[in-house]
Amino acid sequence: GKKYSQGPLGLGFGWGFDIEINFNTNTSLRTGINLSTFKAGLNYYNSDLTLAKETYFVLDASENYVNWDGNNPPDGDLYQLYNRKFKVNYVNIPVILKLKTNEIGYFTYYGEFGATLGFKTKALVDDEIKPLDYNQSDSSFSNSLNLNQKLYILDINADKSTQPIRIGLNLGAGAEYNLSGNTSIFFQLNWNYFVNNLLTRPENEAFLREETSKGIFNAVDAKAIPGNIVLSFGVLF
């Protein structure tokens, strides 16, 4: 069984500048700097997750997470978390080895592989939730709106929930079309696999708790090892 599962796929975007250092006609090193937005989802509780525990958090009046110490929820608005959609911005530095064919007509084809180092600049989440009230006398929950439905809270600051750095393996292929002289347009497709957990350590996420037994709440140890497929195009000169 599963405790967590992949949520909805996200469509991100980015832009940047690259530098190529040519070793010879067919081999070069590509690096530079680019900005990107990564989007992905994680399911914390649904009928398909047979091992899932109910997960809770509390927000203050400014919709910031409130740290949860002890077994009773802290003061604030209490919610059960069902699904979380991440929107994380990064500054990325690629280090890529690029292997090119000789020019065929006006086209040069290439494959490339290497790594990308990303530094987080901002993280937001959209949470699918249910508002709750908690009765300390019998450790029970009740729906605070008397409605059996889920709601959304958008753009909650999630810097404490996500790692500051990500490391990705990069594999791609593409083509360059020569316009004139040293000026070409290019398009390429890359697959990135990020080797470290997107989410922070449980002790750093002190505001998120799962109920392991009635009235007993422990830290959530969710893991998300994401990847993405990137379609790029631009101008070389």
Regions found by a protein language model. Give the residues of each.
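Outer-membrane beta-barrel transmembrane domain signature
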Residues: K100-A206, F237
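Extracytoplasmic loops and strand-loop junctions of Gram-negative outer membrane beta-barrel proteins
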Residues: G1-K3, P74-Y82, K150-D159, T212-N218
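Flexible, surface-exposed loop regions and adjacent strand-edge segments
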Residues: Y4, N46-T55, D126-N135, P202-E211
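Glycine- and aromatic-enriched membrane insertion/assembly motifs of diderm outer-membrane
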Residues: S5-P73
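Short sequence motifs at beta-strands and strand-loop junctions characteristic
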Residues: G7-G12, N83-Y90, E103, D159-G168, ...
